[in-house]
Amino acid sequence: MNTLNDAAATQKSGPAHYDPDEWALRCALANCYHLIDYMGWTETIFNHISARLPGDAHEYLVNPFSLNYTEITPENLLKVDIDGQKVESSPFDGNPAGFALHGALHQARDDIRCIIHTHTTPISAVVQKKNGFDHNSFYGAQLFGRIGYHTFEGITLYEHERPRMVASLGDKHILALRNHGIAVAEGSVAKAFFLLWTVQRAAEVQCAAGALPGDDNPLPLPIQEKCAEQTAMLIRDSGFANKFFDAMVRKMKAETGRGW
């Protein structure tokens, strides 16, 4: 297996009216939606994942609102502009609650190519706590210095919240939405999925540890910093995330027989 562009994560060729790069991105994003459902991280038809298309137009792909994640295919993904307006005809509309978040981050950061927003129970529980994520587990340490926190202002429907979300994220790749959920923002679909998996594991371990008696064994600050730097390097400089994503797609398809 090579990369997500020609391995299990995509189909090798698509309809003639699609540019090959766009079709590869559509396939990767559709597989990501199916994976999020497979992992049990969905909230029925809610939440959203976006992938920015190549070029300077800041157009991106996102899920049609009303479809289950398992019903999403490469062809029924919406193509929208930075304000959430459809740029291609579709019988579906998007979720207005997603446009402010995704549009703001895609417009502000050219290094961001995929954003996954969800609120699993462990993640929502952790971001409800005043101190948010700790960094004392194997997974939590990998997130040290990589999380921006954003104060809950209600459902993200309004453009006036955009600059504050951008400021809260800064140069980081994880936006913890206090009392709400999480948005991970990375340079590819595979990288974003791997980062979300790490965040989810950190939240699960933190919740489990918090339910046990006794004090935590805190990790020294230099170890937390080292773990975060190592993980960032693996995501940035290697095919680590692609290998993980492709393997998870193969596992999902082997166990569920999913396709489109």
Region spans (language model):
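Class I SAM-dependent methyltransferase SAM-binding "motif I" and its flanking Rossmann-like core
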Residues: T121-P163
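Short, intrinsically disordered, mixed-charge
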Residues: Q107-D110, N131, A167-G170, W197-R201
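A conserved C-terminal secondary-structure "cap"
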Residues: N2-C32, H173-W260
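An anion-binding catalytic pocket shared by soluble metabolic enzymes
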Residues: P15, W23-I116, I123-D134, G140
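A contiguous binding-surface segment within folded domains or other stable secondary-structure elements
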Residues: G148-V184
